[in-house]
Amino acid sequence: MPKTAKKHREALAKIDRSRTYPLVEGIESVKSVAYAKFDETVEVAVRLGVDPRHADQMVRGAVVLPNGLGKDVRVLVFAKGEKEKEARDAGADHVGAEDLVAKIQEGWFDFDTAIATPDMMGVVGKIGKLLGPRGLMPNPKVGTVTFDVGRAVKESKAGKVEFRVEKAGIVHAPVGKASFDADKLKENLLALVEALVKAKPSAAKGTYIKKISLSSTMGPGLNLDIADVQSKLV
C-alpha cells in the first residue's frame, strides 16, 4: 500500500464520521490528522438553505479573517495616476492598466486577487472571460472594484476571503493553515460564519445554516455542531 494511502486510512480511522464535533474539538481533530509534508490549508464547507438558481437567494461577499491565511497573497491592481501610486504604496505586487491586460491575454496569471478602480472596468472587461472562470474578476460586491485601492490592497494582503454559494447551496472557503493555533482557526472560522449570516438573503426561508464541515487539504473531513458554532458568534 502506498505511504499516502496508508496515512489517509490512519487519519480516517481517527475521525468519527457518525457524530458532530464541538467547534474546538473539531478544529483540534482536523489539525491532528493533517499528515502531508506541506502545511495543509484548513477549509470549511457550509451548506446553506438557499437555492442559488434564484437571483434573490444568491449569497456572495467577502470577509477579512482576523488571523489571515498564513500565505503571501499576490495582489494585482488595475489603476492609473494617483491611484496607481496609492496601490503601490499599500503593497500591491503588480499595478498597471493596458500593459497588464496585454500580459494576461498572453496567459500570465501570477497573482491571487485582482482589484480595479471603477474607471478601469472598461479596460478590464476585455479580459473578463479570462479572469471570470478563475475567480479573479474584480467585483464591487466583494470590494474589489473601488477607488479606495489602498484599503482594498491592505485587506487582501491581510487575508481577505471572498465567498460565493455554489449550485448545490454550498460555500467553500479557507480559514487558515493546519499549523495555526486552534484559537486562531476558531476566530477565523467564526468570522466567516458571521459574514455568511450577515449575507443571508431576505428570500431565504427555513433553516439557513444546514451543515458545517471542516477538513484539511489532504485529511478527512468532519461535521461541526452547528448549535455550538452559532453559540460562539458575537
From Swiss-Prot:
CDD domains: Ribosomal_L1. Keywords: Repressor, Ribonucleoprotein, Ribosomal protein, RNA-binding, rRNA-binding, Translation regulation, tRNA-binding. One of its GO terms (cellular component) is cytosolic large ribosomal subunit. The keyword Cell division does not apply. Part of the 50S ribosomal subunit. Binds directly to 23S rRNA. The L1 stalk is quite mobile in the ribosome, and is involved in E site tRNA release. Belongs to the universal ribosomal protein uL1 family. PANTHER family: 54S RIBOSOMAL PROTEIN L1, MITOCHONDRIAL, LARGE RIBOSOMAL SUBUNIT PROTEIN UL1M. This is Large ribosomal subunit protein uL1. It comes from Geobacter metallireducens (strain ATCC 53774 / DSM 7210 / GS-15).
